[in-house]
């Protein structure tokens, strides 16, 4: 396999109440995962808040590191990883992603899936994902096998623990410079 391109995995900690609750259980420094097709993170996708002011309104989202939810939490900390992939894998990932984009309204946030992680039992519903499940699903459906478990059991910390990803930045999201 000749890696021609890269995708980027953004893990964040906004410091919100929900994040603090999740962190108290996971003990992991980051509890949200997103995927981007460029270093600038201008094409950033995940499952999370559809509306910055309402943590209960969740689903498939195109995120923006300068506006939206992240602008409400300027002290958000993050880690960004690079995964080298082939042109063909990127093509497959974008094809899978476009299915989500075309039908974005039908997707919901898989809140019960988070309980499944705690119980180590996958909880899967049609058209329902949580953030790391979505990112793992995009990778898996594109033929990229990182873990020996279902996407419904992948946590944001699993990305951090994998040696397949190359660390490119850790710090405040608002201070991230893709040119550095």
Q: Where are the regions a protein language model picked out?
A:
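Cysteine-nucleophile amide-bond enzymes
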Residues: 1-180
């Amino acid at each position: 396999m000749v890696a021609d391109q890269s995708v980027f995995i953004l893990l964040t900690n906004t410091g919100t109440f929900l994040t603090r609750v999740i962190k108290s259980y996971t003990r992991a420094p980051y509890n949200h995962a997103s995927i981007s097709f460029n270093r600038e993170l201008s094409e950033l996708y995940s499952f999370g808040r559809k509306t910055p002011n309402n943590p209960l309104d969740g689903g498939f989202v195109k995120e923006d590191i300068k506006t939206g939810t992240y602008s409400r939490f300027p002290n958000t900390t993050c880690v960004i990883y690079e995964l080298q992939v082939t042109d063909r894998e990127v093509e497959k990932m974008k094809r899978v992603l476009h299915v989500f984009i075309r039908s974005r309204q039908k997707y919901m946030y898989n809140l019960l899936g988070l309980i499944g992680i705690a119980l180590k039992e996958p909880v899967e519903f049609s058209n329902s994902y949580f953030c790391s499940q979505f990112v793992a699903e995009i990778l898996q459906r594109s033929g990229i096998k990182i873990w020996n478990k279902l996407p419904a059991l992948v946590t944001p910390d699993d990305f951090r623990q994998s040696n397949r990803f190359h660390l490119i930045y850790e710090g405040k999201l608002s201070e991230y410079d893709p040119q550095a």
